[in-house]
């Protein structure tokens, strides 16, 4: 990893309009990453990146994240083959969020459940209770098979 | 606020496929909210919601967030008029992120800089340094005027 990120400016104008990319990592050293499909803009997933994951993503063109559950660097798709080739990287006004437009390899599935997107459910209210409804049941791969194979 | 959210199940299958909406608020009581334009899917902003903001959003159909900088409930667009009418709410596999598809009122601008989207810059590398490039200079409103008016 050779790419490093300078500390964010305290000057709001510099942060919003200056030429330097100075991501505002939170107290855990993470920024939020929003991932959409470069093909049609569909939201695929939301994840987090530390400086190492962000630098690797920029340098290799393949999306890397930081897994908060495993506390480790996470090359997305390493097990399932559904790696993400980054077509464009954007950041927001206060530089604490990253937007990746990606092309998904493998089964064209981003969710570990085998679905194309992690956002396969709508939220609504039913009899005064908040409920979710699955709108995408199509599995691009069988998680039990794919993740078992890679473990072996 | 009448809508409440039960604690998330510890059973992964229940969380991923059960009918209950049980958002996984983090240790600060927040979930990440990704906001896209219902018209064309453009990513407009990333923000955070506490239970109150999420319940108000579901109940009123107008997007509410929790401002981490002001530590308070934030009805988006209250000052600028650029409120967000929610067309659809989605959640992801582990229910720690929310996706709002919205129609923006007012100037059709979501960013406080007056731009349509907060993601008005691409990220790249120039001479070994990470740089940002502004790709959208169009301001839908003049922030100095709009926010000054509302303060007065």
From Swiss-Prot, chains A, B:
GO molecular function: magnesium ion binding; phosphoribosyl-AMP cyclohydrolase activity; zinc ion binding
Protein residues bound to Zn(2+): 93, 111, 118
Record-listed E.C. numbers: 3.5.4.19
Major localisation: cytoplasm
GO biological process: one example: L-histidine biosynthetic process
Gene Ontology cellular-component terms listed: cytoplasm
Sites where the protein binds Mg(2+): 92, 94, 96
Keyword Lyase: no
Signal peptide: none
Highest taxon of source: Bacteria
Protein family per UniProt: Belongs to the PRA-CH family.
Record's subunit section: Homodimer.
Descriptive protein name: Phosphoribosyl-AMP cyclohydrolase
Organism: Sinorhizobium fredii (strain NBRC 101917 / NGR234)
Organismal lineage: Bacteria, Pseudomonadati, Pseudomonadota, Alphaproteobacteria, Hyphomicrobiales
């Amino acid at each position: 990893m050779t790419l490093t990120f300078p500390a964010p400016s305290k000057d709001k104008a510099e942060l919003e309009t200056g030429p330097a990319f100075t991501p505002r990592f939170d107290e855990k050293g993470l920024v939020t990453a929003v991932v959409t499909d470069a093909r049609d803009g569909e939201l695929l997933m939301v994840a987090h990146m530390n400086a190492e994951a962000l630098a690797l993503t920029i340098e290799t063109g393949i999306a890397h994240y930081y897994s908060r559950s495993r506390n480790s660097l996470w090359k997305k798709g390493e097990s399932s083959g559904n790696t993400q080739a980054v077509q464009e990287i954007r950041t927001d006004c206060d530089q604490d969020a990253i937007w990746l437009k990606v092309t998904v390899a493998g089964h064209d599935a981003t969710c570990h459940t085998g679905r194309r997107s992690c956002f396969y459910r709508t939220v609504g209210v039913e009899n005064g209770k908040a409920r979710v409804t699955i709108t995408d049941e199509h599995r691009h791969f069988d998680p039990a098979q794919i993740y078992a194979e890679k473990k072996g």
